[in-house]
Regions:
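Active-site-proximal helix-loop-helix substrate-binding element of RNase H-like nuclease domains
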Residues: 106, 157-185, 304-312, 344, ...
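Short hydrophobic beta-strand that contains or immediately precedes a catalytic carboxylate
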Residues: 9-10, 132-134, 334-336, 400, ...
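Short active-site loop/helix that positions an aromatic residue
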Residues: 16-22, 140-145, 343-344, 404-414, ...
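Conserved catalytic core of nucleic-acid polymerases
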Residues: 466-469, 517, 521-524, 579, ...
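Conserved "right-hand" nucleotidyltransferase catalytic core of DNA-directed polymerases
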Residues: 230-373, 435, 443-444, 455, ...
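C-terminal polymerase-core module
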Residues: 543, 547-550, 554-607, 775-823, ...
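Noncatalytic, basic helical substrate-engagement surface that gates or grips nucleic-acid strands
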Residues: 2-133, 137-161, 233-236, 242-250, ...
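Non-catalytic nucleic-acid-binding/docking modules located in mid-to-C-terminal regions
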Residues: 2-4, 52-57, 125, 144-148, ...
Length: 910
């Protein structure tokens, strides 16, 4: 019996977008982006190697309007334009596809989905097997006994039953399903507030959209009202979502035969794109699409776990709980998701817990769901008591996504979570800190290729949002169990990539993951705030603001609101006729801070406005707000430290942000006076001195800088002496100030123009200073030039500890964006290395505090500074040990200097 012929249809446009968004940005030495092309070529090679198709077509959307645009003028109107760095990769990719011998289709007037649907239907009618490679849910409507979908992102396949398992509707119901839920990306209206669950429920009950419409009057509740309100657009939504599989195409199936690759053309393309591995494969006889080759360490090429049909269980009986406890006890890795009612971890009340130990299988244990008709749940105390030995078992490895939050929630119930080996949020962050936001929804979309359930889909938004405890338990199970399930899948994909890069693995295992319990303890400790002192400062700031307001009214010749940009424009530029130095996006004269700073050099009123704004910000952000954030139980303020926000590796402090309290003004420093120690205790602050300049000396290896630090000279005075060719003792204060600005300006990639602006000198003079600096410190210039070149070639720079800092705009055609990325390339290794060093110091200090009997706590991390609370009689020991441990946190070619002080409050200790 002859084997059935196979046709493979590839959603080329989908491949391109997914490769662009899922892979680290790459570019060749000319600065041309190439990462998406490489990703698609590798995916095509893999697909052809595994499927060996006789017939194949790679289908792309053609430019121009389609019949859907004629049906609905707003179709896809909300889509963001294709990024320039993606657009520039389209033609090179088309060239590569053709050179690989793969038939390429771009048909004007129709979408790629319609071409794929038509060819699939024709082939199935001729008894061929059809495999459609796509991540697009719309094409699920084409699945039949002969037509299957494959998602190369997850290696998962969807036959008819697979579609039913994934969407809870059959393929022939998909267009009705899509019409109901709509599509925000394609701007398909759908029915307001109708999500996948409701759409599937209706279609399972009524069979078709037409039958649902006939029975619309019988659908009760708010969702029924929404259905009836949207009936007029439903047919339009269905037409927009339905694939036209009856096109008349000029090509026939036999024209889709896979051809021999054009090796010479591939050599030319791969040489220009600098795909060295693919070039080697050609020379080794593996030029054809599908020939074996080692893929780069990218997510698409990882052995990502297939996403099987899900089996999510709600645990409502002790028997079910006991069965899951037995499974968890023998699991290699437990994925844990804690669902709680408050984003404030000090107030978080656990509503339920979800577990997963294998992809596709998970359980949710509801504890506190409280709504009319809610099923009986196991007593929370009973469940937590049963789980406590497992959760506190250090030997049972656990993983979560931002699991520190769950750790806090469990702490409130007397459970100390142990055995946390992995966190998929941190894995995503270590793999590529700039690729995406690191919330679970975004990470799943990027690395698993599907859109998970969203929290707000369950709870609603804004004023009408309900607490999770009022979400129906079956719906909550789908959400919470999926959260636990995808964490395991993300770990499989991300850890394979991270563990393949030794420096990244070290960064994760020795810095990021060990830091989690340190931050947890700092957050639990909180910091003592003198609320009454802050309230007094608020009154004083308000008085200063009133005084400034009175003087401003006098200077302007009449009253106006200093808080109103429009009134400021009228007074500054209309009434007083000050020069317009900048404009807003709408063309209005700007009152931004930078503009006012420049005007304040010559005019009195702009300086008053800046002072007023400074006082207003201190008042609203700190002196008014901090007393309200004192926890009613601990009587302390508890910030939240985020590891996966700043691209450079810096920690972020939020709710409240305690890292941006000003220190350069007397009023800002006074706020730090409200950070106090309890009676008998004191505050100790330990601060790295000029750490980024020391890192610059290490990275550049410049003999002059290294010598200055080795001899413990005043680095700014030493720089001034070098630049101005003076003995150290003859350097003036102004010359030292200039040298300081040059030192720090160069770290942040400041140009001669920026330096001139900061110093208030001519650009030519600033340029001369920079040239003199580089003459005296040639190693710094060499390091900067080499770093910029490496950034262009690789698309990223690295810290001393191997943290990769991707520069998405390093190859941009936009000069401003490109130059900004080049400045980041210089600064990021220094800022990132400083972040890595203080994290290492925190881990070592915490290890010492945890194993010693010293009465002290680490409270805050603020940039290059650690703040402690210690009993007064132990302060000297802490200060000596903190200096020692922080100084030893990294071995650089320069020593790390740590300044340590103590006092009754933070200001005194600094």
């Amino acid at each position: 019996m002859n084997a059935r012929r196979k046709l493979v249809l590839v959603d080329g446009s989908g491949y391109l977008y997914r490769a662009f968004h899922a892979l680290p940005p790459l570019q060749n030495s000319r600065g041309e982006p190439t990462g998406a092309v490489l990703g698609v070529v590798n995916m095509l090679n893999k697909l052809c190697r595994e499927e060996s198709p006789e017939l194949i077509a790679v289908v792309f959307d053609a430019p121009g309007r389609t019949f859907r645009d004629e049906l609905f003028e707003q179709y896809k109107a909300t889509r963001t334009p294709m990024p320039d760095d993606l657009r520039s990769q389209l033609q090179p990719l088309l060239d590569c596809v053709e050179a690989l011998g793969l038939p390429l289709l771009r048909i004007t007037g129709v979408e790629a989905d319609d071409v794929i649907g038509t060819l699939a239907k024709q082939a199935a009618a001729k008894d061929m097997d059809v495999l459609i490679s796509t991540g697009d849910k719309d094409i699920a409507q084409m699945v039949s006994e002969r037509i299957t979908l494959v998602n190369t992102m997850t290696d998962s396949r969807l036959d008819r039953q697979g579609v039913k398992n994934k969407f809870d509707v059959w393929p022939e119901q998909i267009m009705d399903y899509l019409a109901l839920i709509g599509d925000s990306i394609d701007n398909i209206p759908g029915i307001d507030k109708v999500g996948p669950k409701t759409a599937a429920k209706w279609l399972n009950e009524y069979g078709t959209l037409d039958q649902l419409v006939k029975n619309a009057a019988a659908v009760s509740g708010k969702v029924g009202d929404n259905l009836r309100a949207g009936l007029q657009t439903l047919e339009l939504s269905r037409k927009l979502a339905t694939i036209d599989s009856n096109l008349t195409l000029e090509c026939d199936l036999e024209s889709l035969v896979r051809r021999e690759p054009n090796k010479q053309r591939l050599r030319e393309l791969y040489t220009r794109l600098e795909f060295r591995q693919l070039l080697r494969a050609i020379e080794g006889g593996a030029a054809a699409a599908g020939a074996p080759m080692t893929p780069p360490p990218a997510v698409e090429s990882a052995a990502a776990a297939a996403r099987p049909p899900t089996n999510y269980t709600t645990v409502l009986t002790m028997e079910d709980l006991q069965r899951w406890l037995e499974r968890l006890q023998s699991a290699e890795l437990i994925a844990l998701h804690v669902e709680a009612v408050s984003l404030d971890y000090m107030e978080a009340e656990i509503v339920g817990l979800a577990f997963s130990i294998e992809p596709g299988t998970a359980a949710y244990v509801p504890l506190l769901h409280d709504y009319a008709g809610a099923p009986q749940q196991l007593p929370a105390a009973t469940v937590l008591q049963a789980l406590q030995p497992l959760l506190e078992n250090e030997q049972l490895a656990k993983i979560g996504h931002h699991l520190k939050y769950g750790e806090h929630a469990l702490k409130r119930k007397g459970i100390e979570l142990r055995g946390m080996r992995f966190d998929s949020m941190l894995e995503s962050y270590v793999w590529n800190s700039t690729a995406t936001r690191h919330e679970i929804d975004a990470v799943v979309r990027r690395y698993l290729g599907f859109d998970p359930l969203h929290y707000e889909d369950l709870t609603g938004r804004g004023a009408k949002q309900i607490p999770f405890s009022q979400v129906a338990i079956d719906t909550a199970t789908s959400y919470a169990a999926e959260n636990a399930d995808v964490v395991l899948q993300l770990h499989r994909v991300l850890w394979e990539n991270i563990s393949g890069v030794p420096a990244m693995r070290m960064l994760y295992e020795e810095i990021e993951q060990p830091l989690v319990p340190v931050l947890y303890r700092m957050e639990q400790a909180g910091v003592l705030i003198d609320g009454e002192l802050l309230r007094q400062q608020s009154l004083e700031l308000a008085r200063h603001m009133r005084e400034i307001e009175a003087r401003a009214h006098e200077a302007a010749g009449g009253p106006f609101s200093l808080d109103s940009p429009k009134q400021l424009q009228d007074v500054l530029y209309g009434k007083l006729g000050l020069p317009v130095l900048g404009k807003t996006a709408t063309g209005q004269p700007s009152t931004a801070e930078a503009v006012l700073e420049e005007l304040a050099e010559k005019y009195e009123l702009p300086r008053m406005i800046l002072d007023y704004r400074g006082f207003a910000k201190l008042k609203s952000t700190y002196t008014d707000k901090l007393p309200l954030q004192i926890n009613r139980t601990s009587q302390r303020v508890h910030t939240c430290y985020h590891q996966a926000v700043a691209a450079t590796g810096r920690l972020s402090s939020m709710e409240p942000n305690l890292q941006n309290i000003p220190i350069r003004t007397p009023e800002g420093r006074r706020i730090r006076q409200a950070f106090v120690a309890p009676p008998g205790w004191c505050i100790v602050a330990a601060d790295y001195s000029q750490i980024e300049l020391r890192i610059m000396a290490h990275l550049s290896g410049d003999a002059g800088l290294l010598s200055a630090f080795a001899e413990e000279r005043d680095i700014h005075q030493a720089t001034a002496a070098e630049v101005f060719s003076l003995p150290l003792e003859q350097v003036s204060d102004d010359q030292r100030r200039t040298a300081k600005m040059i030192n720090f300006g160069l770290i942040y990639g400041m140009s001669a123009f920026g330096l001139a602006s900061r110093l208030g000198i001519e650009r030519s003079e600033a340029k001369r200073y920079v040239e003199l600096y580089f003459e005296r410190y040639p190693g710094v210039r060499r390091y900067m030039d080499e770093t910029r070149q490496q950034a262009r070639e690789r698309g990223y720079v690295e810290t001393v500890f191997g943290r990769r800092l991707y520069l998405n705009d390093i190859a941009s055609r936009n000069a401003a964006l490109r130059q900004g990325a080049e400045r980041q390339a210089i600064n990021a290794p220094m800022q990132g290395t400083a972040a890595d060093i203080i994290k290492r110091a925190m881990i070592e200090v915490d290890r010492w505090l945890s194993t010693s009997s010293i009465p002290a706590r680490l409270l805050l991390q603020v940039h290059d500074e650690l703040v402690f609370e210690v009993q007064q009689d132990a302060a000297a020991e802490l200060m000596a040990r903190a200096r020692e441990l922080m100084s030893a946190a990294a071995e650089l070619r320069t020593s790390l200097k740590v300044d340590v002080g103590s006092g009754a409050n933070w200001d005194e200790a600094h």
